[in-house]
Amino acid sequence: MLSAVAFVSLAACSTADPPDPTIGWTPERLYAEARDELASGNRQAAIKLLEKLESRYPFGHWAEQAQLDIAWAQFKDNERALSLAAIDRFMKLHPNHPALDYALYLKGLVNFNEQEGLLARFGNQDLSERDQAALRESFDAFKELVTRFPDSKYAPDAEARMRYLV
């Protein structure tokens, strides 16, 4: 009986997760590795690294950039709700951030592309058949961008998308 208990105890120990190789990494290294993963198309791996960066180093430039990159990666992974939540969180935490124009632009894009799928791309879907709430939110984000940041590098594309939506 004692040997069975010892065996079960040892088996339980062997199923523990391996140690996290990123422990001790600087925010710069975490961010660089996440960017490499993004460049390779490994968005889920990048998101995990960016989330680690944000949780380990919650204050400062790297955490702020990680928040934006998480939102972008989720957008590219067609995780609309997660992306919008990340953007809204960033905008609430950093209302005067220098990249707020980008956050507004990304919010507009996420809502603009809300129903763009394979059939919508090749089926010439009529705008009137799309979710009007998402299109309204897209227009509002682009309008706020153009109004608050008229000299932003994102403003010309935002204006073009607004014209398309009207």
What are these regions (language model features)?
Residues 2-10:
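Bacterial N-terminal signal peptides
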